[in-house]
Structure formats: structure tokens, C-alpha cells
Swiss-Prot record:
<keyword id="KW-0540">Nuclease</keyword>
<dbReference type="GO" id="GO:0004222">
    <property type="term" value="F:metalloendopeptidase activity"/>
</dbReference>
<feature type="binding site">
    <location>
        <position position="105"/>
    </location>
    <ligand>
        <name>Zn(2+)</name>
    </ligand>
</feature>
<keyword id="KW-0862">Zinc</keyword>
<dbReference type="GO" id="GO:0008270">
    <property type="term" value="F:zinc ion binding"/>
</dbReference>
<feature type="binding site">
    <location>
        <position position="115"/>
    </location>
    <ligand>
        <name>Zn(2+)</name>
    </ligand>
</feature>
<dbReference type="Pfam" id="PF02130">
    <property type="entry name" value="YbeY"/>
</dbReference>
<comment type="similarity">
    <text>Belongs to the endoribonuclease YbeY family.</text>
</comment>
<dbReference type="GO" id="GO:0006364">
    <property type="term" value="P:rRNA processing"/>
</dbReference>
<dbReference type="InterPro" id="IPR002036">
    <property type="entry name" value="YbeY"/>
</dbReference>
<feature type="binding site">
    <location>
        <position position="109"/>
    </location>
    <ligand>
        <name>Zn(2+)</name>
    </ligand>
</feature>
<dbReference type="GO" id="GO:0005737">
    <property type="term" value="C:cytoplasm"/>
</dbReference>
<comment type="function">
    <text>Single strand-specific metallo-endoribonuclease involved in late-stage 70S ribosome quality control and in maturation of the 3' terminus of the 16S rRNA.</text>
</comment>
<protein>
    <recommendedName>
        <fullName>Endoribonuclease YbeY</fullName>
        <ecNumber>3.1.-.-</ecNumber>
    </recommendedName>
</protein>
<keyword id="KW-0378">Hydrolase</keyword>
<dbReference type="InterPro" id="IPR023091">
    <property type="entry name" value="MetalPrtase_cat_dom_sf_prd"/>
</dbReference>
<keyword id="KW-0479">Metal-binding</keyword>
Length: 140
């Protein structure tokens, strides 16, 4: 089950499309869907988590806590909407594209992809690009 939780004044439009997309990404990696919670927050909220649990005193766009059991994906993905907006401006991409990239970044970590080395980061970016193409908005 994929759920969205909002700690700020923000809400995803077309939640079902996003849920279906995340599910399809998980299946495309030969994993099964467990419980994934997205928590959308602001910089201060995520900074507190970064300091408390990871001992990092920096702003970040996403932090994911992986509770996966074998091939069943479980976890909490915290996303700073402020950071995503700023990154979208910096990278000159639409906000929703950057949001989807960050959302799927956490899931890809659960699937085993890393981003610590340059080679890992290149593979992660390539996988993000691949998975962004799987997103479809259902037309009524």
C-alpha cells in the first residue's frame, strides 16, 4: 500500500496516478509492493530528521528509511517540497518532474540502487530517467 501524508500545505493532484506509477516502478524492478509512506514536509521538518537520525546538519530534498523485507518494498520517504521547488528552479525543470524524480529516487534505493560513488550516481540518474517515462495520468 502506498500512502501520502502531508505535514505542510501541499497536496498531490491525481494521487491515484502517482500510486499506480510507483507500483509499476516496483514491479518493473521485480519487487513486490509492501507499505510505502510518503511524507511531504518543509525544510525545517526534514532538517530535524536529518540531524536526529543521520547526524547531518544540512538541508536535503529526500530522506528514505528502508524497512524492506527481501523483495517486498517497505519504507518511509520524507520529501521537502521547499527543496524540490528550489531544485526545479535551479535545474530549470518543471516542479512536478523534479517531484517525481525525488519520489522515485527513494524507491530506487529500496530496490538496491546507490548514489555514493560517481558510477552509482550515474546509474541512479539513468534509472530515474527510465522510471519517469513510466508515469501516466489516467484520462477520463
Amino acid at each position: 500500500m502506498i500512502s501520502f501524508n502531508y505535514e505542510i500545505d501541499f497536496e498531490i493532484r491525481e494521487e491515484t496516478s502517482y500510486i499506480n506509477w510507483v507500483s509499476s516502478v516496483i514491479l518493473s524492478e521485480n519487487k513486490s509492493e509492501g507499505e510505502i509512506n510518503y511524507i511531504f514536509c518543509d525544510d525545517n521538518y526534514l532538517l530535524e530528521i536529518n540531524q536526529q537520525y543521520l547526524n547531518h546538519d544540512t538541508l536535503t530534498d529526500v530522506i528514505s528509511f528502508d524497512y524492506s523485507l527481501g523483495d517486498e518494498i517497505h519504507g518511509d520517504i520524507y520529501i521537502s517540497i521547499e527543496r524540490v521547488r528550489e531544485n526545479a528552479d535551479d535545474f530549470k525543470v518543471p516542479f512536478e518532474e523534479e517531484l517525481k524524480r525525488v519520489m522515485i529516487h527513494g524507491v530506487l534505493h529500496y530496490c538496491g540502487y546507490k548514489d555514493k560513488s560517481d558510477a552509482d550516481e550515474l546509474l541512479m540518474r539513468s534509472k530515474e530517467d527510465e522510471k519517469l517515462k513510466l508515469f501516466h495520468v489516467k484520462q477520463n
